[in-house]
């Protein structure tokens, strides 16, 4: 736990109290993702020294864009914050966080239409792209809400509908990996970003918890195994973002943390813990090869250290939390 706490402390070094964001110049959604990493750490470890960050961040950020309530110009940005609110509920038991998450789900659902047979649009209000991440996040959010609201049927119905659409969309390719999205309503062959392989795992765990349909876990395990054994995404057994090789943009350094967070959810849900050794190997490599010596970690988990920022550090916190 000491290494995870040190990584959290280093991540908090990027937090700006005046704006309620981690590195305000970075993409807004990454503060929602960093908040989730912090909440996951607190929930797993029982260490709540930074609990004050939750309400401080939420009360500022929920009013920042558009009409408030974490609305943005893309549905995935809203979904990251909504899922963090689900985790805030798990940690505190306070229903107001679920209320925020429900507001997010309803807003995202407003961008579902019949184009390509269903699915939510990524970009709003333009509506030019239906992609994997927005629909994976929406699915996970719907199923998570159902599982936390006794007597619910509406979120479950929407979750099942979303999964049926996603499963039929063609975004899951023949290699068992998820491509980025659709072009003319067919798989666009886009990059297999690690977070697209991850969020769907957590979504299917939540949906299996709701339905008991073992076919869902079979799909999740197929994607997880394809990712963890891929020479493209896990060369030498260490998770690697495709863009690491050419220089990652501002978003990509967050992706591996999102993958391992959701892989851990699957691993802890399945009795035999099939991905425990993989997660342990990632953490060992991170600690040995990716640090600057001050508990800050770069994007290359196999090394060498490149630089420190919120996205890289939140991914490290995600990873070290999985092995607590």
Where are these regions (language model features)?
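The canonical alpha-helical register within tetratricopeptide repeats
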Residues: 10, 56, 60, 103-107, ...
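Active-site cradle of extracellular carbohydrate-active enzymes
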Residues: 135, 142-146, 154-207
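CBM-like carbohydrate-recognition segments
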Residues: 1-37, 41-80, 88-92, 97, ...
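Extended ligand-binding groove/face enriched in aromatic
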Residues: 52-144, 157-160
């Amino acid at each position: 736990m000491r290494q995870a706490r040190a990584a959290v402390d280093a991540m908090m070094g990027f937090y700006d109290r005046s704006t309620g964001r981690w590195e305000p110049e970075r993409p807004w959604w990454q503060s929602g993702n960093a908040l989730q990493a912090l909440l996951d750490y607190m929930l797993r470890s029982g260490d709540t020294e930074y609990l004050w960050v939750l309400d401080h961040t939420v009360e500022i950020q929920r009013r920042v864009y558009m009409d408030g309530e974490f609305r943005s110009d893309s549905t995935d940005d809203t979904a990251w914050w909504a899922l963090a609110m689900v985790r805030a509920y798990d940690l505190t038991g306070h229903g107001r966080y679920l209320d925020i998450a429900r507001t997010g789900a309803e807003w995202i659902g407003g961008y579902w239409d019949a184009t390509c047979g269903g699915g939510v649009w990524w970009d709003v209000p333009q509506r030019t792209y239906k992609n994997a991440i927005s629909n994976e996040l929406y699915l996970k959010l719907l199923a998570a809400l159902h599982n936390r609201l006794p007597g619910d049927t509406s979120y479950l119905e929407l979750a099942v509908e979303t999964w049926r659409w996603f499963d039929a969309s063609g975004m899951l390719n023949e290699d068992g990996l998820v491509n980025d999205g659709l072009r003319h309503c067919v798989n666009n062959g886009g990059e297999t970003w690690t977070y697209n392989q991850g969020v769907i795992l957590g979504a299917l765990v939540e949906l299996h918890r709701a339905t008991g349909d073992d076919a869902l876990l079979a799909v999740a395990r197929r994607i997880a195994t394809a990712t963890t054994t891929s020479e493209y995404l896990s060369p030498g057994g260490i998770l690697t973002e495709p863009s690491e090789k050419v220089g990652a943009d501002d978003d990509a350094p967050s992706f591996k943390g999102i993958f391992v967070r959701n892989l851990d959810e699957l691993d802890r849900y399945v009795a035999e813990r099939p991905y425990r050794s993989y997660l342990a190997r990632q953490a060992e490599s991170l600690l040995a090869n990716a640090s600057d010596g001050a508990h800050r970690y770069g994007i290359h988990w196999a090394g060498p250290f490149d630089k420190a920022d919120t996205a890289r550090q939140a991914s490290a916190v995600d990873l070290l939390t999985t092995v607590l």
